[in-house]
A protein has these predicted regions:
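Short, low-complexity intrinsically disordered segments enriched in A/P/G/S/L with frequent Arg
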Residues: 13-15
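N-terminal phosphate/diphosphate-binding loop that engages ATP/GTP or pyrophosphate donors
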Residues: 55-102
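Walker A (P-loop) phosphate-binding motif
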Residues: 27-58
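Residue-identity detector for glycine
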Residues: 8-11, 20-24
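General beta-strand structural signal in soluble alpha/beta enzymes
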Residues: 41-42, 62-67, 98-101, 125-129, ...
Length: 244
């Protein structure tokens, strides 16, 4: 397992499209150009919801798990094991399972089996590889995110609700955000500053702007165009899962 993997080293070609705006019947998994193997989801508000949406949409077998901490998913079987044959049997029965190691406060930590082993059992292993203290935006410390070695795609989630708010209220690790973007702790998070933070860290292959419908098209455009100019693919959407 490794920390802070810079993008561009996955061995997978980046999609040619630079910006996708959610609409019609295009699934999130299609917009993200999901590929089989390990996908790491990092960033802020909406990571766990994105994991669930992808599990619902993808047609193959799926393991939802974490390299940090995550709560179990309601309605999705939880498997705690170091036996890969149990994993295969569970996937054959349920198609989608959650895996991890029980920890404090009902949370799960990383599973007992290596992610590379899980990837040999399931079509997709989707790993929540970050935490954000439930804030809409985040800057990463040197030990973050915790991206598995064999990750083929890294998706960064950003919540549009953080735009227009003071840095110290909207950003997890605001001091790092300020250092990388030139923002001030009492200053306002603009779409351009949020994008500049992502560019400076250079951790993701693709960026998801969650709750895009809560901001004006012009604000969303400023965010996406700044990222587009640096070669990032951006999906603008509002993440909602269909299962209760």
């Amino acid at each position: 397992m490794r920390h802070s993997r810079k993008r561009g080293h996955s061995g997978v070609s980046r999609p040619a499209v630079n910006m996708v705006v959610s609409g019609g019947f295009m699934k999130i998994c299609e917009q993200l150009h999901m590929i089989k193997g390990v996908t790491a989801v990092i960033g802020s508000g909406g990571k766990t919801t994105l994991l669930r949406i992808l599990a619902e949409e993808l047609s193959g077998t799926v393991i939802l798990t974490t390299s940090t901490h995550i709560l179990p998913f309601a309605g999705i079987p939880l498997l705690v094991t170091d036996d890969i044959e149990q994993v295969r049997r569970a996937l054959a029965l349920h198609r989608v399972i959650c895996m991890g190691t029980p920890a404090a406060e009902g949370k799960l930590t990383a599973p007992a089996l290596p992610f590379s082993v899980l990837a040999n059992a399931a079509d997709y292993v989707i790993v929540e590889a970050d935490g954000s203290k439930r804030l809409p935006l985040k800057a990463h410390a040197s030990h973050e995110p915790v991206i598995p070695e064999n990750t083929r795609k890294t998706v960064c989630v950003v919540c549009a609700s953080g735009f227009g708010k003071p840095v110290k209220q909207a950003v997890h690790r605001p001091e790092l955000f300020c250092a990388r973007t030139g923002a001030h702790m009492s200053g306002i998070v603009t779409p351009k500053l949020a994008a500049q933070g992502i560019i400076a860290e250079n951790l993701a292959d693709i960026v998801v702007l969650n709750q895009a419908e809560t901001v004006s098209p012009e604000i969303a455009k400023r965010f996406t165009e700044t990222l587009k100019s640096s070669g990032f693919t951006v999906v603008c959407t509002t993440l909602n899962h269909t299962l209760e």
